[in-house]
C-alpha cells in the first residue's frame, strides 16, 4: 500500500510512492486458476468498485511498460495539452480493442492555495518557510522523534486531530511563529483558499508531457492496436499548433528500441 511491489521480476513496471495507490501480487497454482482469478477480479472490480481505477493483469514478458498502448502529448500550455490529450483519448476509446483509456496526470485534486503577503510577513518577522512549516505540521504532520521496535524505526508524527485537519476554519486558525517569539494566525500574513490543480505534472525533455494510456482486450497485439489508432490520429497531428506534438509509446516503442539494439550488433555477428 502506497507503492508498488519490489522488483521480483525483471519486466515489472515499478511504481512511484503515492498514498492513493496499492498493488497486490497473486500467485495461482496453475494456468487455468490464473485465468479464473483474472476474470473474477475484473468482474468484481468493475461491478463493486466503480469509483476507482483498478486493473487485473497478467505479468507480461518483454520491456516493462505501464500500459500496452500509449500516446504522449507534449507542449507548453497545460490547458492546450489537456485539450489535445482529450482528442487522443476519444480516438483511443473509439477502438474496439482498447480498455480503460486514461491519462497519467489523473483527475484534478482539491488543495489549499496559500498566497503569502510578503509586505505583512516582513513587518511581522514571518518567512514563507515558517508559514509552510506551520501549515504542513498542522495538516500532514511533522516527524518529531523515532521509536525503535526490534530492527524497525517508526516515525512519531505530531499533527492536529483529524476533525481540525478537515475543517477549513481550523486551518485558518493555525498559528505561525514570528521573529519576536510570538505567534499570529496564518490569515494575518497570507490568504488561504480552496482550489483544484493537477496532482502531478510529468515532463519529458523538460517539456510538459501528458501520456494517454489504455489496456487491450484479450486476443490482440498491442503494436497492431497502437498502429491502427496512430493512423486515426493523422488528421489531428496535421492540425497541431507549433510546439505541440503527439508521439507513440507503450509496447510498440519499447519493442522498437529492443529491435534497434539487436540490429546494432547484427553486422558484427555476421562479420564474425
Regions found by a protein language model. Give the residues of each.
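Solvent-exposed, membrane-proximal periplasmic/extracellular interface segments of envelope transport
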Residues: 1-64, 119-141
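Surface-exposed aromatic
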Residues: 6-8, 66-69, 110, 156
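Flexible hinge/switch segments at interdomain interfaces of large molecular machines
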Residues: 14-21, 53-68, 72-74, 102-109, ...
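Extracytoplasmic/periplasmic membrane-proximal domains and adjacent transmembrane bundles
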Residues: 82, 89-269
Amino acid at each position: 500500500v502506497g507503492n508498488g511491489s519490489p522488483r521480483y521480476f525483471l519486466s515489472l513496471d515499478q511504481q512511484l510512492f503515492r498514498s492513493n495507490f496499492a498493488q497486490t501480487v497473486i500467485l495461482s497454482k496453475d494456468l487455468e486458476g490464473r485465468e479464473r482469478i483474472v476474470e473474477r477480479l475484473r468482474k468484481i472490480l468493475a461491478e463493486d468498485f466503480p469509483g476507482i481505477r483498478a486493473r487485473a493483469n497478467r505479468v507480461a514478458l518483454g520491456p516493462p511498460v505501464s500500459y500496452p498502448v500509449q500516446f504522449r502529448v507534449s507542449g507548453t500550455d497545460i490547458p492546450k495539452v489537456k485539450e489535445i490529450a482529450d482528442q487522443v483519448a476519444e480516438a483511443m476509446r473509439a477502438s474496439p480493442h482498447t480498455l480503460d483509456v486514461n491519462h497519467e496526470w489523473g483527475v484534478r485534486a482539491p488543495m489549499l492555495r496559500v498566497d503569502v503577503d510578503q509586505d505583512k510577513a516582513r513587518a511581522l518577522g514571518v518567512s514563507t518557510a515558517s508559514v509552510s512549516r506551520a501549515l504542513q505540521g498542522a495538516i500532514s504532520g511533522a516527524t518529531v522523534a523515532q521509536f525503535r521496535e526490534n530492527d524497525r524505526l517508526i516515525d512519531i508524527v505530531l499533527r492536529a486531530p483529524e476533525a481540525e485537519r478537515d475543517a477549513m476554519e481550523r486551518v485558518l486558525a493555525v498559528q505561525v511563529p514570528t521573529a519576536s517569539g510570538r505567534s499570529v494566525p496564518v490569515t494575518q500574513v497570507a490568504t488561504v483558499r480552496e482550489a483544484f490543480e493537477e496532482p502531478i505534472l510529468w515532463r519529458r525533455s523538460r517539456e510538459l508531457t501528458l501520456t494517454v494510456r489504455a489496456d487491450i482486450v484479450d486476443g490482440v497485439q498491442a503494436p497492431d492496436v497502437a498502429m491502427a489508432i496512430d493512423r486515426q490520429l493523422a488528421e489531428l497531428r496535421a492540425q497541431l499548433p507549433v510546439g505541440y506534438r503527439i508521439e507513440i509509446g507503450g509496447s510498440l516503442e519499447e519493442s522498437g528500441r529492443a529491435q534497434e539494439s539487436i540490429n546494432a550488433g547484427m553486422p558484427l555477428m555476421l562479420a564474425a
